[in-house]
């Protein structure tokens, strides 16, 4: 299937190069660094590798030829794999399939199939299920053999999935799962919509019935209210004209008094501004002083911590000094003991040499004496053989007895020596026991210290963790506060924009507020809603109480009204105007007090903050309005109190003083007063949250410092624990050494005891033998008494010679025993000297360790002392700066006192002027009260009718046939009844009937879509289940077939052994990993990581060929896979490859000549030009043993 590979500008292949791959084994050879492996990299790159690292580069531009000494760099890299598709294996209608990848130096890249641009997804789809791919078994590069065995089981299963051909199923499954997820999301969303529409449909069916009843009652109510409104409007117009004339005179007097008050107010404001300037300067100075104080506290805390650490380090240094002195004392004693031992050893060795010389001398003397005895015995034998026989028997008995006596003496001497050695050994054992107990106690004490240190570390670590948890909670709180602040800020911004744009204010009012006439602007105060400050919770009630009057323009005289009348100010809609100079002094109901009654919240004007100038206006507008909890409370209070009071309930219902009421839920728009109050509240909350965030951030800073401090404390505890652990390890090593010495001493004592028992037994046996020999000798003497006379002289000579021989033998035996003792003493002293030398070496190492610790401690002390000195200098500078800040604060305090005194003087004069204004205002209020009452009633009536029925009482003419009301009470009763009927109907959707039909159609359509999505979901779930079942079956069948092939090929490749593939236990085989077990012949079972390089490679090759045997890949690339093989394994490797040539073709990159012998096609790659790879034709004999290509 693989036909050729073409390269152009790819890595070191600067020129266009083509490699044809005919059937069989194609071998690529060349020296190291010639670019052979770039052929494998090119194949991986074309097949979709996205990792520059796997291509042995830093980024993808590294695949482009970089140039050489004689060539410039290439602008692009290109590689093409050509597949033979005459059999139609690939889903492309062409005899050849060219898969090309190209990348430009600009970073752009492209994939092409038969010169048509495609996506990487299309390339992967083309080769999926064929065994071809960068992660499949068709590309085995350097190092991948080892990774195939050492990879985890789940990563390794990808190779078997490719062999089973289920990778395409996995892609389909992933796509189906994505579609299922989208369907489920849409199904959930559509289900919510269907439920919502169904609920709305049910509601509309109920609303349609209400709509008809509401229409009939509202039409009759409109008819009656219109007639009543026109009659009331005409009556109120007459009253209003009379009140206006009386008000103008009083307003002129009010303006004079107000001018003086404004002048004094300007003086007071100037003084307050100066006082504010001084206060700002004082705050800045106080802030600077606070920062200096904080810096002093921080540096002082750090200095105190350093001082504590310095004391601890000095204590540590003193401890090191004491330990060093103790170790030096101990070392001096040990050196003296070592010298004594060496001296004793030298004396013992000299004594041993002297005894050896004596032993040799006495041995020669013994030989001489034995020769003399033999000569005498020979002469005696010649005289009388019979006598000699008797004498021989006696002599033998005596000799035996002498030997027994000698054994007895030797045993006695040995027992004496053993007794002496036992005393010495027992003393050494006691000393070793004392040393062992002392070191064991030291180890136990160190273990206790380590346990204490571990407990301290755990406590410190718990403190650090707890503080960090608190710190994280504080940071989360800051995040939550910032989110709240952001929401409130956004709401405030929207409200501010509405306020700036004057949303909700009628066009005529905006035109009046935007007028440019400076003279007229002097009389303009603003609209009612903008001049009040009220709590946000009460604001909706004030909006309800004011009604349209919240948009009334407040003026100080009649110039604005005159300008509107003259046409100087052009307005598009009607404008309500309130003149401060014409307000009445009192209104009906001002003096009525309902405070403290059940259900009463308070009087409306008392809920408002405003400037002093506007207080009469507030009393005028709201002085007769009371806020109560419910409508029932309002009705009850109206019956108890006199007429003239208005009531507003907590839900926004209004019970007016004329008996009318406005009830029901408020509209969706926020009132002007509510909006202004909400904006003020939002700004206040912004300040509140900003303060909380600042405080929380301070707390975070503090906690961060605490964490650092606690972490440092934890570090100190851990350092102490490490110190005790180090000492404990040294003590355990010493304990081990002492234990070994104790064991040796105990073994010596035990051996001496066994030797003593043995010699005691030998002595008893010898005594028994001596008694028996004495009896035998006595009998022999009696036998030879008759013969002694004849041979007396000979016997005397023989006895004398024998005695001499026995003496010499006894002396020789004594010298031998002495020599044995000397040798034993030399050996004992040699062992003692070796032990002392080892102890001395260990003491010197411990001594050096303590000196190193002292050096580190001194350096730490110097560092801390330097920091303390720097902190002292900085504290002095900060104290000077703080004194300067205190002096500045004192100066500012004196200036502030002067300004406050000036402000008090101006305020006194201003209060007098305000009283004069108030007196004039009261006069104006008294006169204008009647007018305002009529105007308010008229305006409220007009606004209510305009709002309810779009009838303009102000501009429209009364109907010509206006009916007169003969029985007003019956009409009011009918209106009240109709109102109740309309209200009882509740909220009515007049468009319910039309909307009902449209909604029914939409519901039917959505319900059908929901059923379609449900069916699609079921279908996708069935598809995924079928894919899982097919994949599971294919995977298990494939794994079992490959497993059988692997077992056979492994035994064939290794000449025996055992190998197996094991599927890990899992609920789903598709999620289980695959383990490889390989045991070469003659070796025990062990981990794959312990296999040799050759065994790993041959095992991987056997596995690879097992996969090929089950599902042949069109080709297989092996990049220096045979590098770890010896000659025998290469032969097996080549044999395995040749067996699969009828199923696939192989491209092998190698240095081995034995592998080259199996090649049907041989390519050489060299760098005849530096940095540029070139394909060359070679012969087998042109390649050296190390893969070098010899020049022709």
From Swiss-Prot:
SMART domains: SMC_hinge
All residue ranges annotated as the SMC hinge domain in the record: 522-636
Protein name per its UniProtKB record: Chromosome partition protein Smc
Binding site for ATP: 31-38
Coiled coil: 164-197, 234-292, 333-369, 396-464, 676-736, 772-902, 986-1030
Native organism taxonomy: Bacteria, Pseudomonadati, Planctomycetota, Planctomycetia, Pirellulales
Quaternary data: Homodimer.
Record GO cellular component, one term: membrane
Family: Belongs to the SMC family.
Keyword check for Metal-binding: no
Localization annotation: Cytoplasm
Main location: cytoplasm
Described purpose of this protein according to its UniProt entry: Required for chromosome condensation and partitioning.
Gene name of this polypeptide: smc
Pfam families: SMC_hinge (PF06470), SMC_N (PF02463)
An example Gene Ontology molecular-function term: ATP hydrolysis activity
Biological processes per GO annotation: chromosome condensation; chromosome segregation; DNA replication; signal transduction; sister chromatid cohesion
Assigned keywords, A-Z: ATP-binding, Coiled coil, Cytoplasm, DNA-binding, Nucleotide-binding
Domain notes: Contains large globular domains required for ATP hydrolysis at each terminus and a third globular domain forming a flexible SMC hinge near the middle of the molecule. These domains are separated by coiled-coil structures.
Family annotation (HAMAP family): Smc_prok
